[in-house]
Design a protein with these regions (language model features):
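Internal active-site segments that recognize and position negatively charged phosphoryl groups
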Residues: 133-161
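Short, glycine-biased loop/turn motifs at secondary-structure junctions and
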Residues: 62, 95-98, 153, 162-167
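Conserved small/polar residues in nucleotide/adenosyl-binding loops
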Residues: 170-172
């Protein structure tokens, strides 16, 4: 999937799913321009996620769920399409199972998750003068570093697997 130049997600209080979804899009297209709003403009040309009832919005019925019953949130929906291209099918599945599913579960059910809580603390408090979008992008910067580390780790495992496979062929 080619990442367009523009992205749109919901405004207001943000959560780990839209923050990590944005981080993923920035990793794949560093120059992407993300807009936050409450209504997707009719003439918007780009990728829309966590709003708008499209392919990457989980706020619609029936909710898409994984075979294990965990419902997708925006990050999981994007990762399902984009993750394998970054780390391969096997590592994408493992990252989904171990990292993304707990975030998606929190977003859909309120299940306790410390990382989701930490991302949530970037939201400005009720009497703050901070710009909500600026707070969102601070959270995205942290999420992006975490996700880049996840991707690098997964690709290191892929390189190690290849090396072991090469060595095993030599010794046959």
């Amino acid at each position: 999937m080619k990442i367009p130049a523009n992205g749109f997600t919901h405004a207001g209080k943000f959560h780990a799913d839209d923050v990590f979804a944005t981080a993923l899009l920035q990793i794949l297209r560093p120059d992407i321009k993300i807009t936050r709003g409450f209504v997707v403009p009719d003439d918007f040309d780009g990728i829309v996620y966590d709003i708008g009832f499209g392919m990457f919005d989980h706020h619609q019925e029936p909710r898409e769920t994984r075979p294990n019953g965990i419902p997708y949130a925006a990050f999981g929906l994007l990762w399902r399409v984009l993750g394998p291209g970054l780390v391969g099918e096997r590592q994408a599945r493992l990252i989904d199972e171990n990292f993304i599913q707990p975030l998606d579960l929190n977003d859909n059910t309120g299940e306790q998750n410390s990382l989701c809580d930490a991302i949530g603390f970037f939201n400005p408090v009720w009497d703050s003068k901070e710009d909500q979008d600026a707070c969102f992008f601070k959270a995205v910067a942290v999420a992006k570093q975490i996700l880049e580390n996840q991707i690098e780790s997964a690709n290191a495992v892929n390189r190690a697997d290849e090396k072991v496979q090469q060595l095993s062929l030599i010794h046959i």
